[in-house]
């Protein structure tokens, strides 16, 4: 009536000898989006496969999936159409060592070390033309422009501080002669322990001061004369007296 169920053998030999239906299990796996992109590839648009491969590699590098190896496993388990050439997807460590080329090139303003600095400072070349030969070759840099600009300025003359004895002797020499040149200036500079340039500059400044004082004195004298004449005229008008030019002196003879 009822037959006993056959006993199953769970020995190692029976388990190893048993073939697992790999094709069936593979067919039951869920289809992932990456597999759909490979399955839908066609020879009409060969660049689409390369785009999906790069997108999958970038997603793996950013950590979109919990395990980056899943993306590469999908690519292996679902090969694309053999008629269309597909670039292989590099592993994550290769992506880290060799990043994908950026589609945006750096702005030309940031590549200053590769450009001629004279294009940045055209006004400087126009202003200091005699320094133009220095801004050529490997030395052309913004630092060299600023350095040459600072060196191009004429240094300010240091004002000499004369001692009282030196000023006294210079004043005596100026009273004798307002222009000291040649051997006289050289001898005066040597006696005062000064340079000829210092003596020359002092005499130039002293002549300028002398001319200014003379003009001020002449101006003050003319103003005093005008003031005196004005007061005399007012007194004559008030007293109704004639000026000496208007008095006619005649003799009785």
From Swiss-Prot:
This is Homeobox protein EMX2. PROSITE patterns: HOMEOBOX_1, HOMEOBOX_2. Its main location: nucleus. The keyword Repeat does not apply. GO terms for molecular function: DNA-binding transcription factor activity, RNA polymerase II-specific; RNA polymerase II cis-regulatory region sequence-specific DNA binding. Keywords: Cell projection, Developmental protein, DNA-binding, Homeobox, Nucleus. Residues 155-214 bind DNA. Belongs to the EMX homeobox family. Gene3D superfamilies: Homeodomain-like. Signal peptide: none annotated. Pfam families: Homeodomain (PF00046). GO terms for biological process: anterior/posterior pattern specification; brain development; cell proliferation in forebrain; central nervous system development; cerebral cortex regionalization; dentate gyrus development; forebrain cell migration; neuron differentiation. SUPFAM superfamilies: Homeodomain-like. The gene is EMX2. One of its GO terms (cellular component) is nucleus. It is found in: Nucleus; Cell projection, Axon. InterPro entries: EMX-VAX-Noto_Homeobox_TFs, HD, HD_metazoa, Homeobox_CS, Homeodomain-like_sf, HTH_motif. Residues 213-253 are annotated as: Disordered. Interacts with translation initiation factor EIF4E. Residues 225-234 have a biased composition (Basic residues). Transcription factor, which in cooperation with EMX1, acts to generate the boundary between the roof and archipallium in the developing brain. May function in combination with OTX1/2 to specify cell fates in the developing central nervous system. In the inner ear, it controls the distribution of GPR156 at hair cell boundaries, and regulates the organization of stereociliary bundles in opposite orientations across the line of polarity reversal (LPR).
